Amino acid sequence: MAITAQMVKELREKTGAGMMDCKKALTETNGDMEKAIDWLREKGIAKAAKKADRIAAEGMAYIAVEGNTAVILEVNSETDFVAKNEAFQTLVKELAAHLLKQKPASLDEALGQTMDNGSTVQDYINEAIAKIGEKITLRRFAVVNKADGETFGAYLHMGGRIGVLTLLAGNASEDVAKDVAMHIAALHPKYVSRDDVPQEEIAHEREVLKQQALNEGKPEKIVEKMVEGRLNKFYEDVCLLEQAFVKNPDVTVRQYVESNGATVKQFIRYEVGEGLEKRQDNFAEEVMSQVRKQ
């Protein structure tokens, strides 16, 4: 297939590799983005894919907690102007209150539910769109329940650019649970522990690391040992409990949590716009579009 400049740009953003290397990788893999990432890694050109695709959409993540129930949600807007608008932020908080109270099981169920004001959730969002003049969407949410004795940790970074909700069992204080949430916001782990990593992901990583070592010219008899060592580094990248604790790098998150008599049961991390693309307006046009609405 034809390799476009946009494909090369996307691969560069995902791997940090040079333009010509990205073009060659895409050519060698017939334009398959994931295989091109693996090709670059196997050649030692890229260490790993960046942890998130380009983040471009605007909006806000928010967390609400009441008793033994918590909700984390993401609401998207088209521009940062609207995301910082008081009316938009009020909408997000009212949606959070509804989700916390009604505990819908899916997005479709949530949008069809009736709010305390008599409107359905979807109609309420549509009314906000009409007033604000910009597309607004409830993108995702999760309702989490805890048992007595368990602890929620909630952390919002940069006014809701990133939201993290943690659930700890044991004797953890809210401060400990929040510290873990702050760590997750900064380090972006995918899983709690090694046990949570899917076997197919481990097998894929093992094969990439093996090819990487062979391409470095290492003797085959020591390749397996190298792979196991590098696999440990992979676990440190993706598993929360394996990571050096951001507030005290001398201990792992596991050691920090256990020293406080707790264990991590679950976490949810929302970063606004993950995987979404924003309209290609430039900043001047964005300003003008808002001025015209005044």
From Swiss-Prot:
Any one GO MF annotation of this record: translation elongation factor activity
Recorded name of the encoding gene: tsf
Signal peptide bounds: none
Predominant location category: cytoplasm
Cellular component GO terms held in the UniProt record: cytoplasm
Keyword field: Cytoplasm, Elongation factor, Protein biosynthesis
Identification of the protein by name: Elongation factor Ts
Biological source species: Geobacillus kaustophilus (strain HTA426)
InterPro entries attached to this UniProt entry: EF-Ts_dimer_sf, Transl_elong_EFTs/EF1B, Transl_elong_EFTs/EF1B_dimer, Transl_elong_Ts_CS, UBA-like_sf
